[in-house]
């Protein structure tokens, strides 16, 4: 066999499973069709760590709660920015209050004692700055926020350093059963393996039949980053409970404020501001720093591991709490594989991620020390987010380094500022071209057909 395990899909779950399996004496590959890994994490590099009480599906709720309990351990291990903060689900009328009561009943049924049902002004004890006529709320203490892309990258980078082969820009075309394994045909090659772990959403590749119909019922999520420190507004995440809508406000890891609104219609961002205004006090268009879109799914989680004896595991997590679920799910899938293949732990497993610098978070003394070692850190490329050339170069040279403008942007924050990359994008393209030994016209934004500079008016020796 070419590989012991082939993981289809290099999203956060595929990378997390690769990390857990890289601890053992296995030959592993991850096949990802995109230029980069972890493209399924939100472009705004902060995800909510949920508790599971808001979820009615039993399996989803269990996975979320178990993942929540593991998250702090993994964040500390990988040195990923992570912040614990409580969540308040609020109801402004009797209809909304029914949802609050259901959540509280679920908590009692599961013997979860750390949630609190608050009536009327009791909420002010937990969030004194909240305004409006709130008749009922539920307080959940063990939620939080995490740098989701950093977490996903950490999984991938450590797996790569421990021997996992990441095959990017390679699309799976077919999977066929053979004696004691599978034959995989991709757009570039053919492989055999003992076990396939399919984390993709492409039903055409799945060998098992599902009763669930494939659909696209995801909600449209609109994020707005508000130019106000979150600590001046609230200390907890605030969810305004609505039927078929999600309205919330939460901090980012950098203490910025995110307001979010979602429903099944792709609304204009003016509607988003209107919806989140009751939670954000006085805001205007001038307070909006960045606007981003995302798709929000709440589909049942499918984990078909009952056919592990045949060597095929199908995982489908099209769910808003995917980041929260990941640690527990990956740990359990790896246990199944280890038991199936009877493999042993690597003595030379390296569980450390290579360090990196966030220049804007350092003191002047720390900055000067780094600049003495590498002068590239003394040249600021992104003025909005204070990202240096040294950070961009490091993001390209790291394990599974950036190969696109979006890859640099997500790893470093360059281009996420109020100018949305107008000032720094050309410079990022130059650095990418130089580091990859390519022409600037060959550098892409995020995918094969997303070239930014189409042609040159005149050829120069340098750009």
PLM region descriptions:
Residues 3-30:
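N-terminal Rossmann-like FAD-binding beta1-loop-alpha1 element of flavoenzymes
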Residues 10, 53, 200-201:
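Glycine-rich, N-terminal phosphate-binding loop of Rossmann-like dinucleotide-binding domains
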Residues 19-20, 49, 80-82, 195, ...:
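Active-site substrate-recognition segment that forms the wall
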Residues 23-44:
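Glycine-rich FAD pyrophosphate-binding loop
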Residues 46-122, 126:
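Dinucleotide-binding Rossmann-like beta1-alpha1 core, especially the glycine-rich loop
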Residues 81-89, 124-154, 158-162, 261-263, ...:
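Helix-loop-beta segment of a Rossmann-like dinucleotide-binding subdomain
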Residues 138-187, 191-195, 199:
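Helical element adjacent to the flavin cofactor pocket in flavoenzyme catalytic cores
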Residues 281-402, 406-418, 422-463:
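Helix-rich C-terminal "cap"/substrate-channel and partner-interaction subdomain
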């Amino acid at each position: 066999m070419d590989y012991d395990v082939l993981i289809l899909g290099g999203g956060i779950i595929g990378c997390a499973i690769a990390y857990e399996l890289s601890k053992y004496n296995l030959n592993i590959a991850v096949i990802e069709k995109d230029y980069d890994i972890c493209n399924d994490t939100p472009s705004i590099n902060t995800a909510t760590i949920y508790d599971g009480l808001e979820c009615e599906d039993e399996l989803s709720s269990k996975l979320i709660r178990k993942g929540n309990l593991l998250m702090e351990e993994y964040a500390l291990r990988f040195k990923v920015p992570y912040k614990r903060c409580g969540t308040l689900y609020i109801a402004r009328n009797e209809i909304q209050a029914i949802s609050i009561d259901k959540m509280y009943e679920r908590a009692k049924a599961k013997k979860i004692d750390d949630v609190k049902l608050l009536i009327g002004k009791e909420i002010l004890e937990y969030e004194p700055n909240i305004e409006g006529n709130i008749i009922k709320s539920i307080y959940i203490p063990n939620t939080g926020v995490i740098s989701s892309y950093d977490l996903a990258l950490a999984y991938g980078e450590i797996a790569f350093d421990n021997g996992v082969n990441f095959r990017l820009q390679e699309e799976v075309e077919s999977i066929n059963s053979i004696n004691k394994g599978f034959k995989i045909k991709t757009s570039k090659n053919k492989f055999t393996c003992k076990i396939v772990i399919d984390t993709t959403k492409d039903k055409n590749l799945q060998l098992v039949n599902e009763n669930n119909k494939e659909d696209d019922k995801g909600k449209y999520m609109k994020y707005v980053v508000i130019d106000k420190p979150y600590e001046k507004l609230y200390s907890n995440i605030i969810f305004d409970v609505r039927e078929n809508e999600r309205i919330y406000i939460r901090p980012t890891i950098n203490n910025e404020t995110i307001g979010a609104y979602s429903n099944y219609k792709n609304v204009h961002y003016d509607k988003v501001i209107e919806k989140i205004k009751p939670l954000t006090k006085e805001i205007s268009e001038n307070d909006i720093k960045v606007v981003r879109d995302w798709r929000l799914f709440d589909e049942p989680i499918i984990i078909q591991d009952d056919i592990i004896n045949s060597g095929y595991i199908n995982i489908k997590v099209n769910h808003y709490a995917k980041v929260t679920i990941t640690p527990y799910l990956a740990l359990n899938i790896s246990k199944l594989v280890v038991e199936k293949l009877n493999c042993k732990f690597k003595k030379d497993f390296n569980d450390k991620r290579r360090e990196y610098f966030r220049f804007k978070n350092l003191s002047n003394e720390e900055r000067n020390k780094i600049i003495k070692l590498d002068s590239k850190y003394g040249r600021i490329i992104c003025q909005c987010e204070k990202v240096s050339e040294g950070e961009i170069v490091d993001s390209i040279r790291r394990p599974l380094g950036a190969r696109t403008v979006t890859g640099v942007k997500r790893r470093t924050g360059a281009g996420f500022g109020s100018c949305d990359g107008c000032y720094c994008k050309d410079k990022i393209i130059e650095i990418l071209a130089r580091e990859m030994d390519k022409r600037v016209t060959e550098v892409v934004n995020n995918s094969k057909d997303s070239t930014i500079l189409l042609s040159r008016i005149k050829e120069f020796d340098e750009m």
